[in-house]
Structure formats: C-alpha cells, structure tokens
Amino acid sequence: MKVYFFLILYVFLSFFSITYSKELEIDKIIAIVNNQIILNSDVNQVLFSLKEEDQRVKIPLKINFLRNKIIKKLITETLILEEAKKFNIVVTDDQVNNVLSKYALKKNITIEELKRNILMNNTNTSFSYNDYFNKIKNSLKVKIIQDYVLHNRVHISEKEVDLFLNKLINTQNELKKIDINCIFLPFIKEKNKIFIKNTKILADHFAKKIKKDASFNYYYEYFKKNNNIFLSKEIRSKSLKYLKKIFLNKLKIIKKNQILGPILGLKGFYILKINKIENENKENLTTEFHIQHCLIRPSVILDDKQAKNSIYYIYNNIKNKKYSFDYAVQKLSHDVYSSHKKGDLGWISTDFFSNDFRNFLTDLRKNEISKPIKSNFGWHIIKLLDIRQVDKSNRIDKNLVYRFLLEKKIKKERYNWIRQLKKSSYIKIFKN
C-alpha cells in the first residue's frame, strides 16, 4: 500500500503545482537524453510543487540548486523508461486503475471524486486526466524495471548474512554485564620470563584439579579466608568489553557456572567462574519456529485475488502429487532469497508473527505442509521443520540482517546501474 501511496503522491507533486504565467511563453528544451527531450515545464512541475511545500526554496540560490537536482532526476527517469521499453515492460490500464482504486480507498473517496480533485487542483489548462494516468503508468514502469534489474544484479550469500549476524551478536554480547569469581595467582614485582613460565605451569596444574574435582567454590572460599600464593577476587557487573581489557586474551563466555582459565591478565594468572550473565532468565525465553515456505506476493501486476488463486493452485498440485513442495519453492516462489535453499527461512521468533499466524504455526506438526495462509508479505504454504525456545534478549533476526544487507547493496548497485546508463547515453543539458 505504501508503494501505491508514494506513486500517487509523486504524480500529484509532478502535475498539480504549475503556476499560471500571464504571458504565453514558448516551452524551452532543458535537456536532451538520447532521442528524448526534457522541457522547462517538466522541471517547473516539480519545482513549483516544492515551493508550495517549503517557502524557503524561494531563495534564488536554492532554486538553482533544486532545478539542477530536478533535471538530474528527470534525466535518470528518462533513461530508466528507455530500459523499460527495451525489456518490453508493459503496464496495463487495469494495473493503473488498481493503483488509483487503492489510493482512493486510502483517502476514503471514490474514483470519480479522485478524478474531480485532480482536475480542480490542476492550474495547467493543457493538462488532462489522461496525462495524469500516463504519468502513473510511467512510474509503475520505472518501479518494475528497477526492481527487476537490481534484484538480478544483487545477491546476498548465506555466508555474508552469517558473518554480519555474528558480528552483531558479538557486539551485543560484549555489552552484557557479567559477574565473575576469580582465583588469582599474582606475579611478584621482579618478574622475568622464567618466573612467568613457572607460574603458568602452576596455574595450569591447579586449574585442571579444580575442573576435575568441581571444587572451584571450595578453593575460592578457602583462599578468601586464608593467606596463600593464590588469592580470591570478585568482579561484579562488568561488560565483556571491559573484561577483555583486564585479561590479555579473548574470553569465550558461553553460560553460567562456566570455568575458564588459567587466563593471563595484567597482574597474573586467573581461573574464572561465571556467576551471572545479564538477562539470563526464563522471563526472556521466547518460542522460535524453523520453517520453509513457498511465497506468492501480490504486486502491481498481480493483485491479492490473483495471488490467492495462484497459491491455492500450487497447494492443490502439491496435495495431488503433481509436483513436490521443494519443486514449488524452487520454481514458483516469489521469495528470491529463500527459494535457492528450499525456502528455508531459518529460525523466526513467535514475536514476528500476528496472533492468527502464530496460532496457525502452533497447530502444525513437524514436517507438515500447511494450507495457504496470508501474511503482510503475501500468501504462503508453510512447512514446519522444528520448534525451540531461546533467550530473546540476545536474539537478532536473521531475515532483518538479510534485508539490511540487501537494501545497502541495492542502493549501491542502483548508483552503478544509473552511472552505466548515463555513460552509454547521449545527454545534453542546456544552460539558461
């Protein structure tokens, strides 16, 4: 729905703010893009709408700046529309009417009221509803070809997602507060390499004994009360990031009651016991589902009813054994990211789903293939692989990581694509 809203908004901004000129002027050519021209009126359609939105753009220097930006935008759109023509991208009148209907519904008005608003708000007598209609059609073409080209040029591997996810998890873990008890073997003031080596041997031997006998607590309390070459020490509510400054190697803290060491620190060797890790309690447990899916997503060329019919057609074919679930995922699913790995979405938290969708998943048996169900993303056929409980305080959604990396790459690739189009085109901008 947001896509439709912004398409409509763009067209309104493009056409409804053309100011009257008391004298009829010849429309000037501002730029030539291959065999297409951009007129002064095209620029003004956008510029004057911006002036109405923000009076500050009346400053001449800012107007010149905006005009240049608008010209560049129009050049880019012209190039993309040429690519759409090469790919034979066709947008039908029904598709445009579908966009208009959804926009009118959002505004709680009828299509006829929308048409009247278009003509009433337009100050350009040469502009008609058909012009507005065609502008939306072009905007849809731009979106379709841009989505097609960029999603074919961009690929996010499983390895990239995992590397970024691990980096986020490690960063998050380093900020957790940790309570530690230490058995500490300090260095003497005049230490040398031989002394450090012998101290390490002693610490290693003692650590093995503690781990074998599970006697850390006994010795910790003993050294706390009695003077010895070993000392007891406690560290409270410190982050892993802080602890790494004290201990001169990486700490691989995994769980409560874990025994680590001996670990070299600034002042000696430490044997550690993890007493508490922040947020490690049952209240933070959440259910996660490991699922595969086949997705049919509504779009500007496939409305919700058509998407529903498609997913039920696929479901019936799977049920009647015309083809397998894996075949449907690989050949028919609209989810490009998961289709190449059998539709595997990995582990997804119950918090991610609506109540109806959550209840739907809960009722499934392991390895059961579901009937079609609708979500905000489209229509799904689900296969439940497994269920588990995890600590949600430290959970990072893998799908969100993928979407973040995808958007980042698409933004970069769009810049490269537009640059290539400009490089291979004839573009002439005329100065005023």
UniProtKB/Swiss-Prot annotation:
Stated EC number for the protein is 5.2.1.8
Provide the leader sequence positions.
1-21
**Any one of the GO CC terms:** outer membrane-bounded periplasmic space
- Gene Ontology BP annotations: Gram-negative-bacterium-type cell outer membrane assembly; protein folding; protein stabilization
Q: Which PROSITE patterns match?
A: PPIC_PPIASE_2 (PS50198)
Has UniProt tagged this entry with the keyword Cytoplasm?
no
The entry's localization annotation reads:
Periplasm
Biological role: Chaperone involved in the correct folding and assembly of outer membrane proteins. Recognizes specific patterns of aromatic residues and the orientation of their side chains, which are found more frequently in integral outer membrane proteins. May act in both early periplasmic and late outer membrane-associated steps of protein maturation.
Among HAMAP family, the record links this protein to: Chaperone_SurA
Q: What is said about the domains?
A: The PPIase activity resides only in the second parvulin domain. The N-terminal region and the C-terminal tail are necessary and sufficient for the chaperone activity of SurA. The PPIase activity is dispensable for SurA to function as a chaperone. The N-terminal region and the C-terminal tail are also required for porin recognition.
The protein here is known as Chaperone SurA
Native organism: Buchnera aphidicola subsp. Schizaphis graminum (strain Sg)
